[in-house]
């Protein structure tokens, strides 16, 4: 069995090595000719899976995407061809949630404006939006959720309108899929008019899709309003973001919010489980066995951490400033965006760091935030 796999997908060899011959490929430049003889195709979001790519292949048994979203996959075409498909919903939700939370802590420190006491509006309450809310609520932050689709489906959580978030939130964090049509289309959801309407000193965080914000309009509005603070992990026109926009963001990264070791492993592992199920064989590998030991054994806390100390704990796990600096230095290079993604040293999630503290009940919130070793 020939397993064609994106070269940037981790842990493929230990998980799929027993199932067939693994052929690594560049996901962004993948051609129909390369796919022609594949039995299994494993991709990430940089690969467009459609008739153009697959029409020459009559052997394909399974397509898997190690991603939350599926907007890069023509699902109708796969269904028409009866080709089983699986993605990995929620695989990197924890990573994205922690990234957004860390970015907010970093902004709070940079501008001497504590996160505690602010109101955060989350637009899109799926896996990543929910994970972001979980971090914020663990820390005691008031969260407003906006998701008209979830609300219509009967989700029991309390939802508010986007206008309410615009009026009440100090921070807005975007977590919607990209949709181009329909009542709730998200392309340019934040257009020039909405960007201009942001209340003074709003922090705007985008970890979903670049097209959700009109990037040209964002440049125009930000140049007029220095009070707005931007955290941008995604960009219109990836992998070539508008060069004028990058310097206007407080933190800028190349679509890596979901790039935790745990998240990447989880994505590949979910595809492994689904392929095994399809082939009717036992999935006998373990996710935990894939992950290396974290380089910091444990941190002993003398007192329950304040916000400054919490940021320091977060930096033990992931220092966002490093990726921000590297991105600014390399994004204008040829293939700079993709090269940084490809060579990214995947960070760990909070769960990799064990904390020790005598007054356990005082730090239950750290456990709820995801850290190990403390709390109930």
UniProtKB/Swiss-Prot annotation:
Belongs to the D-isomer specific 2-hydroxyacid dehydrogenase family. PdxB subfamily. Pfam families: 2-Hacid_dh (PF00389), 2-Hacid_dh_C (PF02826), DUF3410 (PF11890). NAD(+) binds at residues 147, 233, 258. PROSITE patterns: D_2_HYDROXYACID_DH_3. It catalyses: 4-phospho-D-erythronate + NAD(+) = (R)-3-hydroxy-2-oxo-4-phosphooxybutanoate + NADH + H(+). PANTHER family: D-ISOMER SPECIFIC 2-HYDROXYACID DEHYDROGENASE CATALYTIC DOMAIN-CONTAINING PROTEIN-RELATED, D-ISOMER SPECIFIC 2-HYDROXYACID DEHYDROGENASE FAMILY PROTEIN (AFU_ORTHOLOGUE AFUA_1G13630). It comes from Shewanella baltica (strain OS223). HAMAP family: PdxB. Its EC number is 1.1.1.290. Substrate binds at residues 45, 67, 259. It comes from the Bacteria. It is found in: Cytoplasm. Homodimer. SUPFAM superfamilies: Formate/glycerate dehydrogenase catalytic domain-like, NAD(P)-binding Rossmann-fold domains. Pathway: Cofactor biosynthesis; pyridoxine 5'-phosphate biosynthesis; pyridoxine 5'-phosphate from D-erythrose 4-phosphate: step 2/5. Keywords: Cytoplasm, NAD, Oxidoreductase, Pyridoxine biosynthesis. One of its GO terms (cellular component) is cytoplasm. Gene3D superfamilies: 3.30.1370.170, NAD(P)-binding Rossmann-like Domain (3.40.50.720). This is Erythronate-4-phosphate dehydrogenase. One of its GO terms (biological process) is pyridoxine biosynthetic process. Transmembrane segments: none annotated. Catalyzes the oxidation of erythronate-4-phosphate to 3-hydroxy-2-oxo-4-phosphonooxybutanoate. Its main location: cytoplasm. One of its GO terms (molecular function) is protein dimerization activity. The active site is at 209, 238, 255 (proton donor).
């Amino acid at each position: 069995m020939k397993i064609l796999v994106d070269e940037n997908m981790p842990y493929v060899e230990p998980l799929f090595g027993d199932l067939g011959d693994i052929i690594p490929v560049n996901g962004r430049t993948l051609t129909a000719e390369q796919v022609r003889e594949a039995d299994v195709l494993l991709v990430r979001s940089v690969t467009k899976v459609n008739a153009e790519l697959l029409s020459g292949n009559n052997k394909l048994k399974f397509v898997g995407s190690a991603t939350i979203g599926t907007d890069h996959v023509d699902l109708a075409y796969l269904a028409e061809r009866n080709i089983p498909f699986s993605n990995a919903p929620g695989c990197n939700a924890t990573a994205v949630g922690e990234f957004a939370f860390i970015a907010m802590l970093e902004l709070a420190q940079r501008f001497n404006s504590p996160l505690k006491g602010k109101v955060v509006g989350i637009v899109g309450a799926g896996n990543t939006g929910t994970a972001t809310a979980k971090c914020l609520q663990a820390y005691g932050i008031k969260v407003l959720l906006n998701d008209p689709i979830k609300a219509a489906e009967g989700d029991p959580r309390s939802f508010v309108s986007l206008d309410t978030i615009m009026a009440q939130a100090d921070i807005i964090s975007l977590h919607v899929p990209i949709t181009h049509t329909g009542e709730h289309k998200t392309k340019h959801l934040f257009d020039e008019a909405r960007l201009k309407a942001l209340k003074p000193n709003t922090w705007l965080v985008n970890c979903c899709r670049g097209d959700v914000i009109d990037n040209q309009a964002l440049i125009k509005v930000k140049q007029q309003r220095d009070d707005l603070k931007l955290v941008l992990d995604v960009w219109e026109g990836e992998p070539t973001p508008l060069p004028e926009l990058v310097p206007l963001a407080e933190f800028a990264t190349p679509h890596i919010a979901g790039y935790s070791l745990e998240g990447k492993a989880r994505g590949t592992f979910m595809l492994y489980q689904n392929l095994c199920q399809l082939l009717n064989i036992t999935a006998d590998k373990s996710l935990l066995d894939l992950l290396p030991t974290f380089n910091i054994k444990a941190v002993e806390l003398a007192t329950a951490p304040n916000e400054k100390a919490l940021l320091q704990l977060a930096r033990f796990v992931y220092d966002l400033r490093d990726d921000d600096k590297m991105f600014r230095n390399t994004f204008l290079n040829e293939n700079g965006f993709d090269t940084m993604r490809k060579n990214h040293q995947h960070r760990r999630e909070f769960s990799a760091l064990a904390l020790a503290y005598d007054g356990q009940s005082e730090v239950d919130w750290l456990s709820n935030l995801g850290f190990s070793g403390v709390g109930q």
